[in-house]
């Protein structure tokens, strides 16, 4: 007989779904009255102190809250997870009765004169007005144990998925949020989807997602179950997914990150199954991770998860971590100190499994899918540089551009260089005097900020493109005549260059209805 696994934490404190749902309307009333909103908190704290809050530095925030009245009380209560005077909390939360909040599992009373929160209740603005999200406390400002059923709040992964999700629609759409957690994606989806369904394996996540929707007065269908089981037989216009994709051993210590599947099995399940739940023309935006293995191209690995027919895929790798960095990052994320025996035991198993599988790195990024009625086509790319603009609607544009290339003769079309495209000629001093060009590049100044190295012929071709000018074939003919060569020597390179720049939005076909 074996004892309990020392690496598996206990569950989180209990919550009462019905009681929390009853609290949602009066809690929203209190928040609106006090100004407990993203904009209200920024105005009260100021930029510098607000930045300190984001860094998990509570002292400057506490100092500012002293002069911020009821709003300061709620910031300390919910964002700093401080012990707060019970009378001050009662005033700030009115018309919520703190006793009701205690029975629901929102608050606890460590002593008769103070209360503290058991949940993180956080305002945020996703670009379409204020929302609130209810999750478990993450320990960034108050030391807490991260429970096995911990429901993650608003983090880097969830916000990156928000920015990466297409919101452009041609009419009412249905949307599935797979692995909703606390409901961040579902809340965001309500701004552009007519009907939103959210699923999660975790019973606690289902409750908190329902509470998040109720607190925002939004109608979201939230159902419990693993993977796509709760929506078996159903199809949607859009799917977003932030599943427990962490590459691991198959052990489950935290349900928000561990799928119970070996290595990148969770991402494989989601990527391979999502097309079955898309309407024709529907799209999916999936957060995913994949292993890099000696002797195997990561692009081929992810592409192998897709069916041979019926899918367009754009796979975007945003980062790659070495095994030690990957394991250390997720140990700390789970609240473990890597120096402790429990963390050491887990890290030993984790690193041994990665070594056994010849894993050299772990890739992370987005998989965009579109359901079609033709053979599957896959474009997999590295995009590891920083981005200023959201990636979301770019995916729809990429699919449109690939469609255009399938149905047009590239050489016979007219083009224009996108206005945000910059040309760079880098030259170094020539030993014999003057300057010698060492590299030529074109940069896209918006969106994914792609850049391509080109040669002198490529630069000349791009200089000759005009929407009201000559077809590409004629531009190449003129260039060939000027160079004294046969146009057949230049045409393949010109077609390949223009095709690549069309896909990345640096060049657009004449008459294109969209700028990219």
Kindly give the residue locations of the regions a language model identified.
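Acidic, low-complexity/disordered tracts enriched in E/D and polar residues
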Residues: 8-73, 141-142, 374-463, 508-516
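Hydrophobic alpha-helical segments that drive targeting, anchoring, or assembly
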Residues: 16, 33-119, 137, 146, ...
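Long, charge-rich, low-complexity alpha-helical segments
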Residues: 70-118, 162, 166, 171, ...
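SAM-dependent Rossmann-like transferase core, predominantly class I methyltransferases
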Residues: 108-176, 180-188, 192
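Conserved SAM/SAH cofactor-binding pocket of Class I
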Residues: 155-241, 247
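Conserved Class I SAM-dependent methyltransferase catalytic core
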Residues: 202, 263-317
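Mobile active-site "lid"/loop adjacent to the S-adenosyl-L-methionine
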Residues: 203, 243-269
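Flexible, glycine-/basic-rich loop-and-beta segments that form/coincide
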Residues: 323-399
């Amino acid at each position: 007989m074996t004892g309990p696994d020392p690496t598996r934490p206990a569950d989180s404190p209990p919550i009462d779904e019905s009681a929390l749902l009853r609290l949602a309307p009066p809690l929203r009333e209190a928040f609106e009255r006090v100004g407990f909103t993203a904009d209200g908190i920024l105005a009260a704290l100021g930029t510098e102190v607000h930045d300190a809050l984001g860094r998990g530095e509570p002292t400057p925030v506490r100092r500012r809250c002293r002069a911020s009245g009821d709003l300061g009380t709620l910031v300390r209560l919910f964002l700093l997870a401080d012990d707060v005077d019970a009378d001050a909390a009662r005033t700030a939360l009115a018309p919520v009765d703190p006793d009701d909040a205690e029975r629901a599992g929102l608050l606890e009373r460590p002593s008769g004169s103070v209360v503290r929160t058991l949940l993180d209740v956080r305002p945020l603005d996703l670009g379409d007005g204020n929302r609130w999200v209810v999750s478990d406390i993450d320990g960034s400002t108050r030391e807490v144990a991260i429970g096995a059923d911990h429901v993650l709040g608003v983090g880097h992964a969830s916000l990156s998925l928000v920015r990466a999700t297409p919101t452009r629609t041609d009419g009412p759409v249905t949307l599935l949020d797979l692995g909703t957690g606390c409901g961040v994606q579902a809340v965001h989806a309500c701004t552009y989807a007519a009907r939103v369904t959210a699923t999660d394996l975790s019973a606690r996540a289902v409750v908190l997602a329902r509470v998040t929707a109720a607190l925002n007065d939004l109608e979201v269908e939230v159902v419990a179950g693993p993977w796509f089981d709760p929506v078996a037989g159903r199809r949607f216009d859009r799917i977003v997914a932030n599943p427990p994709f962490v590459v691991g051993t198959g052990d489950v210590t935290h349900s928000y990150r561990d799928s119970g599947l070996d290595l990148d099995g969770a991402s494989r399940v989601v990527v391979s199954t999502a097309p079955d739940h898309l309407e024709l023309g529907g799209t999916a935006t999936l957060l995913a991770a994949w292993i890099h293995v000696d002797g195997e191209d990561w692009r081929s690995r992810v592409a192998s998860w897709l069916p041979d027919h019926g899918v367009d895929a754009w796979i975007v790798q945003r980062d790659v971590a070495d095994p030690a960095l990957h394991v250390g990052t997720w140990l700390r994320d789970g609240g473990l100190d890597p120096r402790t025996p429990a963390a050491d035991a887990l890290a030993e198993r984790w690193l041994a499994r990665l070594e056994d599988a010849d894993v050299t790195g772990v890739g992370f990024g987005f998989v965009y899918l579109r359901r079609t009625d033709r053979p599957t086509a896959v474009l997999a790319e590295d995009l590891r540089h920083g981005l200023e603009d959201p990636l979301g609607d770019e995916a729809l544009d990429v699919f449109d551009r690939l469609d255009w290339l399938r149905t047009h003769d590239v050489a016979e079309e007219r083009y224009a260089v996108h206005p945000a495209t910059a040309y760079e000629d880098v030259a170094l001093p020539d030993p014999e005097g003057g300057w010698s060009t060492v590299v030529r590049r074109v940069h896209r100044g918006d969106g994914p900020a792609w850049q391509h190295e080109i040669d002198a012929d490529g630069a000349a071709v791009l200089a000759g493109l005009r929407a009201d000018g000559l077809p590409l074939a004629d531009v190449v003919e003129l260039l060939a005549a000027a160079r004294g060569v046969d146009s057949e020597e230049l045409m393949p390179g010109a077609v390949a260059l223009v095709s690549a720049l069309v896909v990345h939005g640096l060049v657009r076909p004449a008459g294109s209805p969209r700028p990219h």
